[in-house]
Amino acid sequence: MSIDWITVAAQIVNFLLLIWLLKRFLYRPILDGIDAREAEIAARMGEAAAVRQQAEARETEYEARIAQLSSSRAELLEEARRAAEAERDALLSKARARLEEEQAERAAHRAEEAARHRADLQRRGAEALLALTRKALRDLADEGLERRIVLQAAGRLADMGDDLREAAGDARQAVALTRDPLPEEVQARLRSDLGDVLEGVSLRFEVDPGQSPGLNLRLGGAQLGWTVDSYLNGLEATLAEAAGRPARRGGHDAA
């Protein structure tokens, strides 16, 4: 059997031509489409990677912001807690100070009330004692007590010379007022002692049964008293001064 090489060669040429034609007109567009698709896929994958990177960057940024916000929130909460504690401490301190102030005011008020009460009791006691003493001296006083008071007053006239002369002025007469009539020798002693201080001034004796036992000497526009009441008034003034309150005003006391 003989081979027709011309036919074989023609078949080979036809096959190669077919391959070329297939590659040229069929496979090339397909390959180009595949390449384009792969390029598109690669581009989209690149875009996806970029998007993923952006997303990861955003996520990292958001996480950082969240962490910062959490830190800021914690700092704000801590600052708010410290501020609340400081305000609470300030309010408690203010309340304690106010309470201590009110307690001090109440204590001072109680002490003041107690002092006022004691002073009132002392005043009432002193007034009662003075009233009883005044009544007792009035009831127990006799001519002998009044005579001794007058003699004591007469002995003090010399020490009161300047005051007596100023009180007398141009007056030429003095009045000695007692509760009971004085004995002649007592009148003479008082007249003599007054004359030694005030020359030319006469002395007249008068009696007032309602007067406190002792001597009231009227001279010009002045009156000097050495009576039981005047002594008690002086004692009352001393007690009132010691108690820090004004004394009741009475006649001039020369005791």
From Swiss-Prot:
Entry's localization field: Cell inner membrane
The UniProt GO MF terms for this protein read: proton-transporting ATP synthase activity, rotational mechanism; proton-transporting ATPase activity, rotational mechanism
Query: Which Pfam families does the UniProt record give?
Result: ATP-synt_B
Q: Does the keyword Cell inner membrane apply?
A: yes
GO cellular component terms, alphabetically, are:
plasma membrane; proton-transporting ATP synthase complex
Q: Which residues cross the membrane?
A: 5-22
Q: Which UniProt keywords apply?
A: ATP synthesis, Cell inner membrane, Cell membrane, CF(0), Hydrogen ion transport, Ion transport, Membrane, Transmembrane, Transmembrane helix, Transport
Membrane topology term reads:
Single-pass membrane protein
Task: Say yes or no: keyword Transmembrane present.
Answer: yes
Q: Which PANTHER family match?
A: ATP SYNTHASE SUBUNIT B', CHLOROPLASTIC
> Which family does the UniProt entry place this protein in?
Belongs to the ATPase B chain family.
How this chain assembles, per its entry, is: F-type ATPases have 2 components, F(1) - the catalytic core - and F(0) - the membrane proton channel. F(1) has five subunits: alpha(3), beta(3), gamma(1), delta(1), epsilon(1). F(0) has three main subunits: a(1), b(2) and c(10-14). The alpha and beta chains form an alternating ring which encloses part of the gamma chain. F(1) is attached to F(0) by a central stalk formed by the gamma and epsilon chains, while a peripheral stalk is formed by the delta and b chains.
Q: What does this protein do?
A: F(1)F(0) ATP synthase produces ATP from ADP in the presence of a proton or sodium gradient. F-type ATPases consist of two structural domains, F(1) containing the extramembraneous catalytic core and F(0) containing the membrane proton channel, linked together by a central stalk and a peripheral stalk. During catalysis, ATP synthesis in the catalytic domain of F(1) is coupled via a rotary mechanism of the central stalk subunits to proton translocation. Component of the F(0) channel, it forms part of the peripheral stalk, linking F(1) to F(0).
Full protein name: ATP synthase subunit b 1
